[in-house]
Amino acid sequence: MPKTSNVPGTDRPADKAAGHWLLAQLGKKVLRPGGRETTNWLLSRALGGQIDVVEFAPGLGITALEIVKRSPKTYTGVDLDPKAAEIVRGRIGNNPNYTVVNAGAQETGLPDSSYDVVVGEAMLTMQTDKHKLEIMREAARILRPGGYYAIHELSLTPDYLRPEVQEEIQKDLARSIRVNARPLTVAEWTRLAEEAGFEVLDVYQTEMALLEPKRMIADEGVGGLAKIMFNLARKPQIRERVLGMRSVFRRHDDHIGAIGLVLRKK
């Protein structure tokens, strides 16, 4: 786990920092909405053999570590945040075939049709629909024909959720996590994927239980949860933010979930 001072967002006050980086400051490693279970589901379906893998916005590098454990031919992380990029470099070791570039997912600078799998978690949700589509099209551009794009994001249910309810959820999320989160329904994620040039192969849905004890034990272990609780007790400003986030997640529990999708480039 990187030192707290090395975690992105530590230069911002607790009331303004993005929620996921506050959780990282507490020692939370898994910051994805569907937890390790969704990440493992994605990787088990998208990875295998001597393949070339790209990961968009690897963050703390937890999934990057899981990817390189599977010994792909190459791994390329793409992260706009230089602190995050440095953390991931520390995770993946000194293999010359495993690298991290400091770039944005909308314009990676990577060559056309050169990779077998792109992985992206908890980053499309934070974009407008226009920017979501731009990132998905960038994934399509760098993938070889038939390549896989594995994504793990926030979702809304049901598909016929009223627009005013969807807007209320988006506003509450933005206020609590200080990021302009725009989750989509399964139907909306599917339409966007198809517009970007993909077909949906498989879908996994689970609860958005990021801050619930059962999920935290599954993701962090008992010792990890104890460390997080200890740090929460010592940092009242962060504790207030975290409790606010959990309150929003619980308030909208009937409509917020986590989704994993395995997409294939047409």
Task: Set out the residue ranges of the language-model regions.
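A short acidic, Gly/Pro-enriched loop at the edge of an enzyme's catalytic core
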Residues: Q106-V118
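Short alpha-helix
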Residues: A181-A196
